[in-house]
């Protein structure tokens, strides 16, 4: 379907726990309505593309996520298959190859995909954010030149904001772009760039003017441009199916025609991109948490101690119930924020901040508790739950750390 535009291992059932879930839609196949069913409240059309995303995650991602993690493989071919379903430009306009879906639709899709591989889906969410920036703020020439190969994921994109000396204080970035005739000469470096070295298009925030946010502009730097180079591939706790490298500019000449928007508009563009990025990464946390609950539930049914299944322990039952409640609460917050962002409401920024803060904190805690329920087995890389823990941890840091989310929320309250 194309989108619119113990002590012993217990046979096959326990082997399934090692591989990870084939998709949280397993309850639906048995005719059982799960209390954590992510399709509740969705339209029939949304349920259809959600099903497509879950099936893709189960067939094309979950069987390979451990290998991608352990061998640090960037699954280019798999992502291009996902792009054939419209997942390369989910909320990009259809005239440049996007699916033209809403922010809520996007959250639904990324949650489903993240059950198959959270790390890969998170990269795809960043790629989507970059394509949206070009689609939303670029000229018609830029949109039609750059977006189509990005929507098919023939080309990949990276978002370049963070620098070695400017993380949460993004407006203090130092990468300079000095205009010389019809080019900008870039000097500086970006840190922790997802897709660094592999991506073809780098959406770069750089300083064309004075200090502060108004001196920042946005330019597209294409791979192969003289003066563009990359640092070493970082060794990370999680997110190993996507490379992370520094992006370095040394007298890198970029055509002025590659500037997105006006001079001085870059910080605004960066922040508008991040509002959606926060919803996207929080949705990836939902997928990891959902998959972890399914794994924990199934493990509790299989694993026996003191002569009976762990599922008979009321303490563990209550923990599982709390995990389910926190998952559903997170999902509701994310979907509320996604709708506000789509409608361009005044409260969208703070709702996105709240959703990102709450969901990434709670979903990481869910994944971590699911690991604890597995006991010693949860600490083995044979079992998928540990990968969901590692891959979801960084969501509390990136796209604006959760401390910054608290700053934005409190500022909004105090200004009332």
From Swiss-Prot:
Pathway: Amino-acid degradation; L-valine degradation
Predominant localisation class: mitochondrion
Residues bound to substrate: 168, 275-278, 411
Gene3D superfamilies: Acyl-CoA dehydrogenase/oxidase, N-terminal domain (1.10.540.10), Butyryl-CoA Dehydrogenase, subunit A, domain 2 (2.40.110.10), Butyryl-CoA Dehydrogenase, subunit A, domain 3 (1.20.140.10)
Annotated FAD binding sites: 159-168, 192-194, 303, 313-314, 372-376, 401-403
Gene Ontology cellular-component annotations: mitochondrion
Annotated protein name in UniProt: Isobutyryl-CoA dehydrogenase, mitochondrial
Organism, scientific name: Bos taurus
């Amino acid at each position: 379907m194309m989108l619119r535009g113990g002590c012993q291992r217990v046979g096959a059932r326990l082997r399934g726990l090692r591989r990870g879930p084939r998709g949280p839609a397993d309850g639906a196949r048995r005719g059982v309505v799960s209390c954590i069913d992510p399709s509740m409240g969705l339209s029939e059309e949304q349920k259809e593309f959600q099903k497509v995303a879950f099936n893709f995650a189960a067939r094309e991602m979950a069987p390979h996520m451990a290998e991608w993690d352990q061998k640090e493989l960037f699954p280019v071919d798999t992502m291009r298959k996902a792009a054939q379903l419209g997942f390369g430009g989910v909320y990009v306009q259809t005239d440049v190859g996007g699916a033209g879906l809403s922010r809520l639709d996007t959250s639904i899709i990324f949650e489903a995909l993240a059950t198959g591989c959270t790390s890969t889906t998170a990269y795809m969410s960043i790629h989507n954010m970059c394509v949206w920036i070009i689609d939303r703020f670029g000229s018609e020439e830029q949109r039609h030149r750059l977006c189509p190969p990005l929507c098919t994921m023939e080309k990949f994109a990276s978002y370049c904001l963070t620098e070695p000396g400017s993380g949460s204080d993004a407006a203090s970035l130092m990468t300079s772009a000095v205009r010389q005739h019809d080019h900008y000469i870039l000097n500086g470096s970006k840190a922790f760039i997802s897709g660094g070295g592999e991506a073809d298009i780098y959406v770069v925030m750089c300083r064309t003017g004075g200090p502060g946010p108004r001196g920042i502009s946005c330019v597209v730097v294409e791979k192969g441009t003289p003066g563009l180079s990359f640092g070493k591939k970082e060794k990370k706790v999680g997110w190993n199916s996507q490379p992370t490298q520094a992006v370095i500019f040394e007298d890198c000449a970029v055509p002025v025609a590659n500037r997105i928007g006006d001079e001085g508009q870059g910080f605004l563009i960066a922040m508008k991109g991040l509002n959606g990025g926060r919803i996207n990464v929080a949705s990836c946390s939902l997928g990891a948490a959902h998959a972890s609950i399914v794994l924990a539930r199934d493990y509790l049914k299989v694993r026996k101690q003191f002569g009976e299944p762990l599922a008979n322990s009321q303490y563990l039952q209550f923990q599982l119930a709390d995990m389910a409640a926190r998952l559903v609460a997170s999902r509701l917050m994310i979907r509320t924020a996604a709708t506000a962002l789509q409608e361009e409401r005044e409260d969208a920024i703070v709702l996105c901040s709240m959703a990102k803060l709450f969901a990434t904190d709670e979903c990481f805690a869910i994944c971590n508790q699911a690991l604890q329920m597995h006991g010693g087995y949860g600490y083995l890389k044979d079992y998928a739950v540990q990968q969901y823990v590692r891959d979801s941890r960084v969501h509390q840091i990136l796209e604006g750390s959760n401390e910054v989310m608290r700053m934005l929320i409190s500022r909004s309250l105090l200004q009332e």
